[in-house]
Each structure stands twice: as structure tokens, then as C-alpha cells.
């Protein structure tokens, strides 16, 4: 059963969409089936030199149904890896 989660970060404009996709996919290749960017924005309410990037992650386990806790854990991992690697901030 597939699970979808959306994330949005404010990130330095030097990072490409491809770099973010690659970074997230590497977190758990068995579980993360797809990462799709659905919005990139620069302008009002975003600091100069930064951009907002929003993406959807598809989780699809092969051997079990994900519990809410499993989903929370992988979501927290995605957030921490993106923040630690790029200095991004989570956008609410």
C-alpha cells in the first residue's frame, strides 16, 4: 500500500531540484519509491538567495503495511537529512 507525504523547505538557491530528489531517494531506497518536485518558488516572503522547494514522497513497502509510527520515523529522517545536508528550513 502506497503512502504519500509532502514536504516544503526554504533552501539555498544553489541546490537544484535534482540534487534534492537524489538526496531524499538515498535515505531509504527500499521504501522510497518516488520523489517528485511539485513547486519551486522564489520571490515574495522568501529571502534573497533562497527558494522554496516542495516535493511529494511516495513510500511503498514491499513486505508490510506501514504503521503511523513508521511513517513518522521516515518523515523525520527526510526532514533531518535535508536540513543537515543543505541547511534548509522546513516551511510550514
List the model feature ranges, each with a label.
Residues 1-92:
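A carboxyl-terminal module marker
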Amino acid at each position: 500500500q502506497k503512502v504519500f507525504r509532502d514536504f516544503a523547505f526554504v533552501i539555498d538557491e544553489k541546490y537544484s531540484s535534482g540534487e534534492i530528489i537524489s538526496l531524499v531517494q538515498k535515505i531509504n531506497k527500499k521504501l522510497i519509491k518516488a520523489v517528485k518536485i511539485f513547486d519551486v518558488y522564489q520571490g515574495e516572503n522568501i529571502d534573497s538567495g533562497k527558494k522554496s522547494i516542495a516535493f511529494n514522497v511516495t513510500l511503498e513497502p514491499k513486505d508490510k503495511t506501514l504503521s503511523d509510527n513508521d511513517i513518522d520515523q521516515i518523515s523525520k529522517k527526510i526532514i533531518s537529512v535535508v536540513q543537515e545536508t543543505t541547511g534548509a528550513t522546513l516551511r510550514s
